[in-house]
């Protein structure tokens, strides 16, 4: 996968050379390049922002600088090109006002050949930038990573990149390690809690069933704990489950947790 990142702080992404991300680049699974948006400016101050039209606080990133940069990285030969060239990357902008980035989005994007991320700063980027490239046939995505605001898009891009790339075949040393993770697959739940040795630490024991050697009981315990944790922390995920896909033990557990499971989707009895 090829990944291009545009930022006024490209050095921020040197962290991508560490850990599994760095190993994936060394193996040729990833090619990551960070570009400095100021390289496409033409004034002595290398300005990338201007005051907001209509007034207001802060500064807004200028569309003409972004367009020169994106035209080049997207392979547009001239501004009048009427459609995106073949093989155009998916163009992604972090935006706190956009839809939430989810594991499903990460899974979809992990199959892409080329991703291009644009990092906003200040009050953000001119809204015409994503609108224009959508009109040219580019697959433009805008995502939020949560209900909070950051100083810029670099942190959000790093979060999305890690979520996406770790799902690529060959990225993880043990591919089974992502199978039972939180939010993974259809009927996604939060993951069960994890333990390691020693069996007793500071008076707190690992649950006995995990030491039993009975894989069936261990699997059931973990599944029940995942259901219980999800019901407590993210009941919306329980409510989205397909009751037809639940086995008898799942139904029993959810009923004990106060959920009704006879309809298409579980419903809390207190609702």
Swiss-Prot record:
<dbReference type="GO" id="GO:0005829">
    <property type="term" value="C:cytosol"/>
</dbReference>
<keyword id="KW-0963">Cytoplasm</keyword>
<keyword id="KW-0949">S-adenosyl-L-methionine</keyword>
<protein>
    <recommendedName>
        <fullName>tRNA (guanine-N(1)-)-methyltransferase</fullName>
        <ecNumber>2.1.1.228</ecNumber>
    </recommendedName>
</protein>
<dbReference type="GO" id="GO:0052906">
    <property type="term" value="F:tRNA (guanine(37)-N1)-methyltransferase activity"/>
</dbReference>
<dbReference type="GO" id="GO:0002939">
    <property type="term" value="P:tRNA N1-guanine methylation"/>
</dbReference>
<comment type="function">
    <text>Specifically methylates guanosine-37 in various tRNAs.</text>
</comment>
<dbReference type="InterPro" id="IPR016009">
    <property type="entry name" value="tRNA_MeTrfase_TRMD/TRM10"/>
</dbReference>
<feature type="binding site">
    <location>
        <position position="120"/>
    </location>
    <ligand>
        <name>S-adenosyl-L-methionine</name>
    </ligand>
</feature>
<feature type="binding site">
    <location>
        <begin position="145"/>
        <end position="150"/>
    </location>
    <ligand>
        <name>S-adenosyl-L-methionine</name>
    </ligand>
</feature>
<keyword id="KW-0489">Methyltransferase</keyword>
<keyword id="KW-0819">tRNA processing</keyword>
<dbReference type="InterPro" id="IPR029026">
    <property type="entry name" value="tRNA_m1G_MTases_N"/>
</dbReference>
<dbReference type="InterPro" id="IPR023148">
    <property type="entry name" value="tRNA_m1G_MeTrfase_C_sf"/>
</dbReference>
<dbReference type="InterPro" id="IPR002649">
    <property type="entry name" value="tRNA_m1G_MeTrfase_TrmD"/>
</dbReference>
<dbReference type="Pfam" id="PF01746">
    <property type="entry name" value="tRNA_m1G_MT"/>
</dbReference>
<comment type="similarity">
    <text>Belongs to the RNA methyltransferase TrmD family.</text>
</comment>
<dbReference type="InterPro" id="IPR029028">
    <property type="entry name" value="Alpha/beta_knot_MTases"/>
</dbReference>
<keyword id="KW-0808">Transferase</keyword>
<comment type="subunit">
    <text>Homodimer.</text>
</comment>
